[in-house]
From Swiss-Prot:
Pfam family, one: Pantoate_transf
Cofactor(s) required for function per UniProt: Mg(2+)
Protein family membership: Belongs to the PanB family.
Protein name (record): 3-methyl-2-oxobutanoate hydroxymethyltransferase
Amino acid sequence: MQKRKTVLDIQRMKAEGEKIAMLTAYDYPFARLMDLEGIDMVLVGDSVGPVVAGYDHTLPVTMDEMIYHCRAVARGLGQAFLVADMPFLSYQVDLREARLNAGRLVKEGCAQAVKLEGGEPVAEVIRTLVDMDIPVVGHIGLTPQSIHRMGGYKVQGKHDQQARQLMRDARAVQEAGAFAVVLEGIPAGLAGQITEALDIPTIGIGAGVDCDGQVLVIHDILGLCEKYSPRFVKRYADVASIIRQGVKEYIGDVKQGVFPGPEHSFS
């Protein structure tokens, strides 16, 4: 039985040049399957809102929802490192709220670390959580909780001023004590520069190949989100078609009186 990965294992992977593979999970079955295949890190993302609950974006997701999904995922993991997103309004109000909510994700949700969005403006929050021994993953670039300010899901850091600010954000997150940082929706060249400049691992999503690791939404790589697929997603399977075909055959069997057959019935 493999032991659960720790912060030290993730940092060692960067030091040794081993790429870090990370995926989202929102329930026990998916978590168990990806853990069996050796995924390094699992993120219970607030992306559960649009991906699982059908929300338009991540902003409506609550702490209670995050804890519920985090607990389910934790039960499916044996060796992967578990990170939980801090949802909107769970850390922006004040430091006391941030400490309480991060603590709940660890205590009730069984997370090993929390992730929060922002650079320089959230450095104090990161420092506060690290001081209470909660590992933190930063998240800069395209931050989904900021979509109203950004005007949607737009690539960040394309202009010199933006790029310089993102470098400052990355350094601020590291100096505040984060052990890793997600770089989302930024030019590949800039992501490479940030990765080179930091001692902590960078996890890219739409940020090119030079990051220390990659993260994607499990439903995206399996083709379960049929309406929209971001450019940075590679689809590894078409599970939606398999599900629809299975449902179609089941409906047909029920309508025709073929199911349940004798082998599915008790005597």
